[in-house]
Amino acid sequence: MIREYGKDREKAAQLVENVGEALARMKQREETVLAVLAADISGNPHYFDRGTAAGQLLVNAICCQEDRELPKGAHEWRDLLLQTGIAPDPISSSVHVYGLHLLTAQGEHPAYEAFCRRKEASVITLENLKGVTGARAGGDTVFVVENEMVFCFLVNALSEKDEGELTLLCISGQPRTAALKVLSLLTEGGYRILYNGDMDPEGVDIADRLWKRFGQMLEIWRMSPEDYRNGISGEQVGAKRLSRLCHMENSILRETAVQMRKTGRAAYQENILKDLLEDLAVYIKSK
């Protein structure tokens, strides 16, 4: 920043203002594509590209704000942006799905119909959603999990028993635009959404924000204080992370947050896999 200031004071001031605007938008937790964000703020879609002064200052500011180390290489750079709601490109924004039918003006999307027939999981990117007008689940309920390993375990355990009733999504941590768009299509179609995530400060925060976004169409699944006790780990959670739990609005998550602040420990989906699996098996059997 000092180097840029030495070159041109006015441009340096504009640089700081633009990065500040990007950080302010990130706080709204609405994911955007990097080029779109850059063009909207500066008029140049490459303004925040890796290697530019603005791009470097943005990364430094994110790391300072999130108390993280600077990324080493392109892979860590992409991960950092994705975790803070900025997709480097339309393909990076994605959601993993099982048993989900996508609808277009021409009818059901043939590629995703093939995955459903084969009982295989697939990936939907933001690019794939161009031209998609709706989404159809196998039953009246859609189950959503936070972590990939949990998603894969459940699909592998249940795909042979499933006769087309089960629809399962994985948002992979902070939900990308692709995931939010698919969830919006499902709630618009009247489907009930059950969401389960890690019971650490970040996971509970994700669940609470999804609940606030989708209202009564989304229910919190297996994240109660009892589930927290069943899934508790030995991992200690620092005071800074625990402070994120002070503003939960969902009543179930608020009670779980109280328990977490008392114990100072995180609980994970992997520790309640049997409960999740049993819930899905009961759902399939009931259809």
Locations of the language-model features?
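Acidic beta-strand-to-loop metal/phosphate-binding motif
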Residues: 190-200
